[in-house]
Amino acid sequence: MSYNLENQVIALAGVFQSAALVDQLAKQGTVAPTSYECSLKSLLKVDATSTLDVYGDIYGLQLGLKELIAVLERKQDRKKVDVVRYALTLLYLEGKVNKRGDMLDVMSQRIAQINTQTLHFEPTHTNIISAFASLYSDTISTFPQRIQVTGDPRFLRVDENADKIRALLLAGIRAAVLWRQVGGRRWKLFFMRKKILQIANGMLR
């Protein structure tokens, strides 16, 4: 995959989309279905030929692009401060994962196993979501710094929602890994903000 800013914006939108979906689920008990499916399916795209191929098409990433643009334009709704916190923590945790070859191997093996399950179940089926959630718990959740999800206890107490949140956080890690693979670095968010904004706005439909 090419080291260019367009690919980095796509991957970064994937990070922010996962963060936004976690926030929706935690506070509203529901998620935007198209965005949700797009993010989950990205976990299964292990042989993608391009960054966009990971997500299928740019339409599935519209939520992530909107969130990214709002942050870079500094027009983020105060009610969505948690989205930024989740996204930045995902980028931080990816850095930790990147140093753990053993963990990356485990994740790769487990994703391959989950991929075989999709021969019988849709990516959004509870069995697949549960498998993603278990993978997140066995790997990313073992780091001292965890993502503390805040929201309505009525929704957070539901086991199915908890699994969905973990699956979405795993998708966020996947996007952060992709972002690094195509040359993404945190300093670019500050020093290349205007260019990233221009590209993200061009992708927005």
From Swiss-Prot:
<dbReference type="GO" id="GO:0005737">
    <property type="term" value="C:cytoplasm"/>
</dbReference>
<keyword id="KW-0997">Cell inner membrane</keyword>
<dbReference type="InterPro" id="IPR007451">
    <property type="entry name" value="HflD"/>
</dbReference>
<dbReference type="Pfam" id="PF04356">
    <property type="entry name" value="DUF489"/>
</dbReference>
<keyword id="KW-0472">Membrane</keyword>
<keyword id="KW-1003">Cell membrane</keyword>
<comment type="similarity">
    <text>Belongs to the HflD family.</text>
</comment>
<dbReference type="GO" id="GO:0005886">
    <property type="term" value="C:plasma membrane"/>
</dbReference>
<dbReference type="InterPro" id="IPR035932">
    <property type="entry name" value="HflD-like_sf"/>
</dbReference>
<protein>
    <recommendedName>
        <fullName>High frequency lysogenization protein HflD homolog</fullName>
    </recommendedName>
</protein>
<keyword id="KW-0963">Cytoplasm</keyword>
